[in-house]
Amino acid sequence: MKDLDTNLQALLTGFRNAIGVPALLLFSAMIGFGSLAQEQGLSLYISILSTVLIWGMPGQVVHVELYGLGAPLIAVVLGVAGANARFMPMTLSMMPVFADSPHNRKWNYLISHFISINTWAEMLHRGHEIRADRRVSYFLGFSATCMFSGVIGVFQGYVLFESMPEMVSLCLIFLVPIYFGLITVSYTHLTLPTTPYV
């Protein structure tokens, strides 16, 4: 994928590569989350907002459960932060992919918000195949597609709550840890570059 001549090409390639298993997985899992949020009494607006702002299924489930229990805001914040702490090592391991990108390093704080299991695995797997100055655009195209499919899934699950058995919604949520395990196993054979990406 070194022939990505423009940022737009890289963005669209990221979009195209996300369509399929990554987007479908998040769409399906977020259907389960949307029905769970409806069951706990969250509004559709808050359910979608929590997806965009928290962007991590464990943290989102903690948010919904603590909200349903009437926990104070500080408890919700600490619970979400603790549940999503797994993103710290994922973020640290992925940042070298962007080391040679020409963007201002301050943007890494914003970029890191879009990291998910899908994007982390994708960039560690394909990052070295993409020109350094196109990696951020590719990442944003891939991530935005995953997030958008997740938001659509939340909406779908919220609206279909009444007709969806609870067991189905819980099974859909459980897709995420299963997928994470499968990705981890499938990428253990990869030897990541030990030198900076070029």
Task: For the regions a language model picked out, list residue spans one by one.
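Single conserved hydrophobic/aromatic residue that forms the stacking wall/gate
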Residues: 189-198
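Helix-loop-helix hairpins and the membrane-proximal interhelical loops
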Residues: 1-54, 65-78
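Helix-loop-helix junctions within the multi-pass membrane cores of secondary transporters/permeases
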Residues: 78-166
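Short juxtamembrane and helix-loop transition motifs at transmembrane-helix boundaries
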Residues: 7-14, 38-44, 70-74, 103, ...
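Alpha-helical transmembrane segments and their helix-entry boundary regions
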Residues: 47-49, 61, 76-77, 109, ...
